Amino acid sequence: MSRNKVEICGVDTSKLPVLKNEEMRKLFRQLQDEGDDSAREKLVNGNLRLVLSVIQRFNNRGEYVDDLFQVGCIGLMKSIDNFDLSHNVKFSTYAVPMIIGEIRRYLRDNNPIRVSRSLRDIAYKALQVRERLISETSKEPTAEDIAKVLEVPHEEIVFALDAIQDPVSLFEPIYNDGGDPIYVMDQISDERNTDSQWIEELALKEGMRRLNDREKMILRKRFFQGKTQMEVAEEIGISQAQVSRLEKAAIKQMNKNIHQ
């Protein structure tokens, strides 16, 4: 698959329209209240960039780009038909996991070499541990380091990571529409998660989305990268006291955003 291909399935990807949020909400109301098929078509065409962003993450699997694009469009159409405006969640946040799910099913059903569910679970747990160890030690962990944390044989970690072909960073963005990017980490399923936990996670993302750039940066460095207030202060050129004050204000504002 080529990242530079312009025409996919007869669609000129260099000229795809982009819908503004308010325009998108209006089209969804027309579709849901009036059954307007033209509104549905506009929503599909206006969100094809989502499909393009997702299929670029599967470019090393030897699949035809046209096939992946068509499968991704099926996921997009399903997300359009099932999207609920009342949840007050950005459409891209809802659609991207559905597009990824549709493509994963296609790849699973068409892959001559099936990877067992247990092996995939080990591989993705290993990726999570890898990212945590990098955050804690600032260096790349060995397969043996990861195996010790997960309490599984070293060979099993190596085999599991090889089996999923192209392990990527959990913090690699899958889609970015100018706001907060959607990361690989966001799409790794956890069977322990309930629907209520999923809704809480979406609420947290929406609450953080409304913070200013500096507040977002401080919270990411503190809680996602595990840095101390002093380390953050040195990186952005302010005092530790200022970081502490900004952090508290950001958390307070985020809590207010969530409960509005």
Swiss-Prot record:
<keyword id="KW-0804">Transcription</keyword>
<keyword id="KW-0731">Sigma factor</keyword>
<dbReference type="InterPro" id="IPR007624">
    <property type="entry name" value="RNA_pol_sigma70_r3"/>
</dbReference>
<dbReference type="Pfam" id="PF04539">
    <property type="entry name" value="Sigma70_r3"/>
</dbReference>
<dbReference type="InterPro" id="IPR007627">
    <property type="entry name" value="RNA_pol_sigma70_r2"/>
</dbReference>
<comment type="similarity">
    <text>Belongs to the sigma-70 factor family.</text>
</comment>
<dbReference type="InterPro" id="IPR014212">
    <property type="entry name" value="RNA_pol_sigma-G"/>
</dbReference>
<dbReference type="GO" id="GO:0016987">
    <property type="term" value="F:sigma factor activity"/>
</dbReference>
<dbReference type="InterPro" id="IPR007630">
    <property type="entry name" value="RNA_pol_sigma70_r4"/>
</dbReference>
<dbReference type="Pfam" id="PF04542">
    <property type="entry name" value="Sigma70_r2"/>
</dbReference>
<dbReference type="InterPro" id="IPR014284">
    <property type="entry name" value="RNA_pol_sigma-70_dom"/>
</dbReference>
<dbReference type="InterPro" id="IPR013325">
    <property type="entry name" value="RNA_pol_sigma_r2"/>
</dbReference>
<dbReference type="InterPro" id="IPR050239">
    <property type="entry name" value="Sigma-70_RNA_pol_init_factors"/>
</dbReference>
<keyword id="KW-0749">Sporulation</keyword>
<feature type="DNA-binding region" description="H-T-H motif">
    <location>
        <begin position="229"/>
        <end position="248"/>
    </location>
</feature>
<dbReference type="InterPro" id="IPR013324">
    <property type="entry name" value="RNA_pol_sigma_r3/r4-like"/>
</dbReference>
<dbReference type="Pfam" id="PF04545">
    <property type="entry name" value="Sigma70_r4"/>
</dbReference>
<dbReference type="GO" id="GO:0030435">
    <property type="term" value="P:sporulation resulting in formation of a cellular spore"/>
</dbReference>
<keyword id="KW-0238">DNA-binding</keyword>
<keyword id="KW-0805">Transcription regulation</keyword>
<protein>
    <recommendedName>
        <fullName>RNA polymerase sigma-G factor</fullName>
    </recommendedName>
</protein>
<dbReference type="InterPro" id="IPR000943">
    <property type="entry name" value="RNA_pol_sigma70"/>
</dbReference>
<feature type="short sequence motif" description="Polymerase core binding">
    <location>
        <begin position="67"/>
        <end position="80"/>
    </location>
</feature>
<comment type="function">
    <text>Sigma factors are initiation factors that promote the attachment of RNA polymerase to specific initiation sites and are then released. This sigma factor is responsible for the expression of sporulation specific genes in the forespore.</text>
</comment>
<dbReference type="InterPro" id="IPR014322">
    <property type="entry name" value="RNA_pol_sigma-B/F/G"/>
</dbReference>
<feature type="region of interest" description="Recognizes anti-sigma-G factor Gin (csfB)">
    <location>
        <begin position="1"/>
        <end position="71"/>
    </location>
</feature>
<dbReference type="GO" id="GO:0003677">
    <property type="term" value="F:DNA binding"/>
</dbReference>
<dbReference type="GO" id="GO:0006352">
    <property type="term" value="P:DNA-templated transcription initiation"/>
</dbReference>
<comment type="subunit">
    <text>Interacts with anti-sigma-G factor Gin (csfB).</text>
</comment>
